[in-house]
């Protein structure tokens, strides 16, 4: 039995954040931490976690981290549908098509901010190809301003993440965790919550947007959020991995 992990990072977030100048309050997010602690590589593109592992993990840096300087700024601000959004989803679908097979027991989708919106959209895209209930979502503080930077809640289209028939989870998703920032006041970071559904566990945690998803150099609060996610994932995957066993390395 195998698991495929797909990691969608937040807007402007990428591995080079780890090398930001000390005077910048920047670091990697919980999305990249998850990929790396699983054993994922930034250089091994088949997603294999080790030479003998049947599990695979794929990582996609955030919207606004592709192309030249102007392209990056425009995508960070507007997240055009036919630019980074399309490129990321296209690559994720290609990775899925190349590596999904009937022995895949679970598909795990992890995302933060706009990356969380991409993860939720990706679930709808793969819904026709996977077994009902076989997908697990673990997302952090979804911000679905895709298409335009909708700062007014009244103007934010629900179609950005909410899918067919007005529900926010396709049938392929068996369980979903949504970690939400309790203290975020910025209008641009209003979360796109999930619908009321027995498959969903929505947890509000102290802190602002990047305290939940990571990205600050001082990331103690984000580490707490990460542990909540890791433990929840462990419970969802116990039937595959065995009691008390996690794929994550050096996490206790």
Question: For the regions a protein language model found, what residue spans apply to each?
Answer:
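Active-site- or binding-pocket-proximal scaffold segments within functional domains
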Residues: 1-252
């Amino acid at each position: 039995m195998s698991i495929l992990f797909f990691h969608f990072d937040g807007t402007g977030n990428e591995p080079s954040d780890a090398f930001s100048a000390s005077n910048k309050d920047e670091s990697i997010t919980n999305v990249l931490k998850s990929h790396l602690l699983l054993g994922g590589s930034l250089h091994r593109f088949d997603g294999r976690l080790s030479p003998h592992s049947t599990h695979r993990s794929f990582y996609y840096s955030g919207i606004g981290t592709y192309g030249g300087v102007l392209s990056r700024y425009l995508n960070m601000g507007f997240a055009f549908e036919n630019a980074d959004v399309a490129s990321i989803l296209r690559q994720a679908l290609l990775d899925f098509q190349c590596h999904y097979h009937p022995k895949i027991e679970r598909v795990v989708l992890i995302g933060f901010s706009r990356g969380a919106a991409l993860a939720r959209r990706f679930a709808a895209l793969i819904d026709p190809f996977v077994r009902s209930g076989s997908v697990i979502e673990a997302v952090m503080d979804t911000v679905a301003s895709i298409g335009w930077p909708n700062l007014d809640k009244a103007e934010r289209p629900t179609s950005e993440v909410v899918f067919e028939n007005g529900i926010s989870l396709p049938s392929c998703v068996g369980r979903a965790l949504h970690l939400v920032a309790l203290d975020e006041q910025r209008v641009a970071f209003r979360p796109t919550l999930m619908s009321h559904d027995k498959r969903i566990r929505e947890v509000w945690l102290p802190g602002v947007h990047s305290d939940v998803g990571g990205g600050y150099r001082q990331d103690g609060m984000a580490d707490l959020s990460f542990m909540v996610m890791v433990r929840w994932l462990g419970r969802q995957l116990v039937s595959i991995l065995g009691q008390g066993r996690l794929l994550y390395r050096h996490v206790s």
